[in-house]
Amino acid sequence: MTDFFNENLTSLHKKLVDKEISATELTKEALNKSKSSQSEINAFITIDDEGALKRAAEIDAVGIDPDNILSGIPFAIKDNIVTKGLKTTAASHILDNFVPVYDATVIEKLNELGIVTIGKTNMDEFAMGGSTETSYFGKTANAWDHTKVPGGSSGGSASSVASGVIPVALGSDTGGSIRQPAAFNGIVGLKPTYGRVSRWGLIAFGSSLDQIGPLTRTVEDNARVLAAISGKDQRDTTTEDQSVPDFTKGIKKGVKDLRIGVPKEYFAKGIDEGVKDVVKKAIAKYESLGAKVDEVSLPHSKYGIAAYYILASSEASSNLERFDGIRYGFSARQDGQTLEDLYVRTRSEGFGDEVKRRIMLGTFALSAGFYDAYFKKAAQVRTLIVNDFAKVFENHDIILGPTTTSPAFDLGSENDDPVKMYMNDLLTIPLNLAGLPGMSINAGFTDGLPVGLQIIGKRFDESTIYKTAYAFEQDSQLFTKHPGVNF
């Protein structure tokens, strides 16, 4: 049996090329792990036995490409990334019977490289949440403690990787939805620069904020997957025509003389003391490895939460207008009802409470008489946050701090307090507002739960993020630690 805890893309690829294992055998193992873990972590909405085995057999028939490290590798895909012929729900009742007729650009790219999609992972409904508890398909559990949340909204992707169920998963990040689950589950999660990866085929939440990114157990694996999904896409005008480097090149150069800034605001009141302690020790390790560390300030980051929930909710209220029960998805049709009745019933019954809350908030912020007071002001705050980062990066290469304000919290403990739930994204949201790349890696543990170290880079400088992360990962060897589960 393949132990994904002790494998990486390089070792799996070697076994496939050397025919120690076939793509079909590897796929069967991933499918079995996915199904056996469901009762405990509920990481998947859909597990595609038939499609995955058919795909693996096709790859075996052609043969593993020795020059392509992703050939025959099982992947899990967050359920807001459309997959042709495979149900895609965004974890919502309103889409619980939706089967796309096309693949997202990232799926096209990965399919060309020979991956095998095992299934679609659980998430907060329409990616709106920080705990993977708002899903129509039930809650997902944390890999390290099944009474804790896995983070959100990409909780299914993170928990499946951290539990050794799957080697690689894709997530999406609008305000921290890759990095927060990565932190809570002790794995590697990257939000790329806005415009690095195509959003075509990603069910939109906040169009100026959303980005697709990889979740993996190691930094080098993460770098390989990012390279595979990056690049200009004519179907997504927000992608930028940037060359896609080999992100693994230079990853082992170390961090000597790297200029690191540590924002004082990221260690302010309200950040869990255990988290602070673990992250400060990680930053001290960088100094011992030769990096130059000093304190910096991001003075407007404290306004990020307020600005984000106006801007993101406003974009969501527009993006979610298309779900009306007419052409696809759930419909509350009844004989004799008016069109307005159909819209009201479909959306009232099809959307969950958190999604309806954000639609209402966004519609209010965009309404006549309130636009200047809310949306325009939030957009101005966003500009100030962009400028804060730009100023710091004039004299620094990387910014380090905690990914989250606390370790994973109890399932159900914050469902009745939306503001408390929103505050969990305090340290991740500023990056989305600024369009910057950011990664979470495991920095250590507090009370037996993982703590994330957030590594923030300049626009389109994911290479320096990977180099920075790799140095700590290899020194700490924390990637060798894993939960006491065996699916």
UniProtKB/Swiss-Prot annotation:
InterPro entries: Amidase, Amidase_CS, Amidase_dom, AS_sf, GatA. One of its GO terms (cellular component) is glutamyl-tRNA(Gln) amidotransferase complex. The active site is at K78, S153, S177. Its EC number is 6.3.5.7. Keywords: ATP-binding, Ligase, Nucleotide-binding, Protein biosynthesis. GO terms for molecular function: ATP binding; glutaminyl-tRNA synthase (glutamine-hydrolyzing) activity. It catalyses: L-glutamyl-tRNA(Gln) + L-glutamine + ATP + H2O = L-glutaminyl-tRNA(Gln) + L-glutamate + ADP + phosphate + H(+). It comes from the Bacteria. One of its GO terms (biological process) is translation. Allows the formation of correctly charged Gln-tRNA(Gln) through the transamidation of misacylated Glu-tRNA(Gln) in organisms which lack glutaminyl-tRNA synthetase. The reaction takes place in the presence of glutamine and ATP through an activated gamma-phospho-Glu-tRNA(Gln). Belongs to the amidase family. GatA subfamily. Heterotrimer of A, B and C subunits. This is Glutamyl-tRNA(Gln) amidotransferase subunit A. It comes from Oenococcus oeni (strain ATCC BAA-331 / PSU-1).
